Design a protein with these regions (language model features):
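Hydrophobic alpha-helical segments
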Residues: 1-193
Length: 193
């Protein structure tokens, strides 16, 4: 269900910002950006802060790894907007489109390390079933992933399980490939602020 709030209801300064974004990028403002600017005191500011910390804060996971986690969680959730956005960002971050495509097509045969594979497998189960157990954690830890890396991956999962559900509930418009590539470039340069 597409909500009209994504098209209107913004303060004059925000409307000006959106106009400038469209002017300089020659792309429509993504609905994800529109959502965080609508009632920033209620959702937007907190969501941006949490997501930025999960995706760009200190971590043993690279930015590319975390973007791939976001794309993988979004794939499990079947969130078209988020899959496209974070696949584009992971492709640019890794500078390796085939690697990203391989992970999203078949995690078990994809060219990634055991630790990342085990972590993605755990995030996929958590996303699909809403729970993981001690065996899941043992598998991740035995693949060489630290407890802090698990916590960091869970933060990515939390951010994009939330965002993906909002994207689908609000009917986020799927951008053109050029729009997603421009968004990915922005996210890699500026993060989620």
């Amino acid at each position: 269900m597409r909500l009209e709030i994504l098209n209107s209801g913004y303060r004059p300064g925000t409307k000006l910002l959106f106009a400038l974004i469209q002017l300089f990028s020659r792309q429509p403002v993504p609905d994800a950006a529109k959502l965080v600017f609508y009632r920033p005191d209620f959702y937007g500011s907190r969501a941006k802060q949490f997501t930025h910390e999960a995706m760009r804060g200190p971590s043993a996971w690279s930015v590319a790894d975390r973007e791939l986690m976001a794309a993988y969680v979004s794939t499990v959730n079947e969130s078209a907007f988020c899959v496209a956005a974070h696949s584009a960002t992971a492709r640019q971050a890794y500078q390796n489109g085939p690697k990203v495509a391989a992970v999203l097509a078949d995690l078990e045969t994809a060219p990634v390390g055991d630790g990342l594979r085990a972590t993605l497998r755990m995030l996929g189960r958590l996303t699909k079933e809403g729970k993981v157990d001690a065996d899941d954690m043992r598998q991740v830890l035995s693949a060489g992933v630290t407890r802090q890396q698990v916590a960091d991956a869970l933060a990515v999962s939390a951010a994009f399980n939330t965002t993906g559900r909002l994207a689908d509930a609000f009917g986020f418009a799927v951008l053109s490939p050029e729009g997603f590539e421009a968004g990915a470039k922005y996210l890699l340069k500026r993060g989620y602020r």
